[in-house]
């Protein structure tokens, strides 16, 4: 088939010069290009969507004097390599081999899975209309800019007489335009960004170097144009490195009622890139050619057609009536002085493979048909559609058959400027964002494969300065959900990621699971001679086992052994004793009156170098002249011989847990914790004493210095079972931003994060579904409680959660481990039974 080259299509680019976000065209017109940031609005946040549409309509209505505007959503290359290079600067030297392997695996897997990794960016193009264009500028245009680009090839083109400062009189106008568009928070682009946006249709789908492409245009405007061909109804772009194919698909019809259609968001369901180009023109409302005149003539035709349809009993009547209703609605809008626009939508999927492009086109057209959106293939119009959809090209002769008329408010029902990203821009891959409301029915891999919206995590970004759009400085994070939903998997994955960067990491493992599991994996990898970087990583972890039956551990959690601050030592000592005896009992009140001075006394002795412990205090109080005090002290001294309490009550002769290692997992054997909502038994109170000590141990760990520290505390729900526990938790949460400390609580309910007398928040929350706690979880996550949001959360499959990030964005997350060597470390249920493999 004969090719239609760009030279035969009768269209050319008219760009003359660029300055910041201003573009000079050869017909004297000047345009401003603004980058429009997107807002993260969950698909189940109806109120947030309505607000965004109102803001968007308010901004667009302010452009009526400009007569038209252009809106582009471009799929820009998401180059992850520079991001990982930035992240690698924070890798800890002792574990960097594993960190590098994980990042390389992510890059390789994404390259195999997706042709393009991209991020959608919105750009608004506005013509700057002014009556103050200088006559000198007009004259210079008339004299020398008839066709500048063709003249540039000649030597004397370099000396054409036009003002090099043409942009000066437009800068104030552009600044005023930014203020008019303040609802959209527009960004004035740099000249490099402006050139790159203008070049995008030429570069679509090609392998490029951005700086190289931009610098060519900066050197000479003649370098703006690039070779393209049109063949068999598609556009072919080429450079030295690659070839790309694209197809321009104009929208022929939208549904008659587009309320809540959210067309732009619907397009996010595709894992391949789709550029969207929109030209919008404000319609005049006066004159015979105005929209009112056209509408009146159409109404008369509808009336005659309806009469004819009635006479012939025609089935055409329904469609004619619907068209008449739309015409009447348009008249009402004009009467209400609403702004009317004609707009033209063009969708442009692209690929480096022609067969893949055709598959994508078919998939897109089938999808749009399901939503009653008709697309045109426009086989003979590809060249004109290509060139007319460049930014700043406001003549759309090739679009005449694709005109959509609506009010500005109706136009905004397409839901522009929605950001579907979650998490940080620099970090480790945590999973994929899931935009489905329905259930994946247990197939978490299908959920992962269906999304190319990557979610990254960085534990210390929240308290860093100059991070745009973040809404919290709090480093703390919570993982919540019932057993079996995936919270342990996520907790271990986050622990591994945190331990790969320059920080000190502590994991409190009350269930004593991790050491056994990690060592088992290490032995397997050693035997099979695989994943050496994982073996080295496991070797770098200091596994501490606190066994109350081992005399070497006696006093490991004694406040006098590890609480450096006198106040912390006294508070913990009182908290532990209060758990064992009733502090509200009158007799015990006498004991606490003597206990506090005794603690202070032995803290003073410790400061002088004496070896003291909790038993030293109890033994001292057995000699108290008050019989009730002595009796209680003898009781506590006797209890200290209990194997579990021996971890916290000692003579101070043994050392505390050593945390010299950068990565530590501390497990406790023999703990008997109460069930959630149940009063603790006598034996369970002893376990709680140990857990309180561990809580203060985290406080000591996090506040020791100003370097980055992270603590993971599993089974943290127990803190809420007693008043003493709640106070310990409150103290733990207060060690945060100023100390560069992050606390991660793994628990069963969002209520475990809340307290009436404590307003310390959590920067991130990962909530796995708990069927009987749907409403309270959604409320805590700041998600409106509706039937859709309930279904959205309830339908999370195993391995999915609803995540709240430091930017205040909430979305459904499919958790993903990107590296096979880590999977056995994360699995909480392992079996060698063949019949348990459901894949058979």
Regions found by a protein language model. Name each.
Residues 67, 120, 502-503, 541, ...:
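Short glycine-/polar-rich loops that comprise or flank the Walker A/P-loop
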Residues 71-91, 103, 110, 493-595:
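Switch/coupling segment of Walker-type NTPase motor domains
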Residues 1-416, 430-431:
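Extended, folded cores of ATP/NTP-driven motor/assembly subunits in large transport
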Residues 71, 187-197, 276-283, 371-385, ...:
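A generic structural motif
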Residues 111-113, 557-612, 754-840:
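P-loop NTPase motor core of the ASCE superfamily
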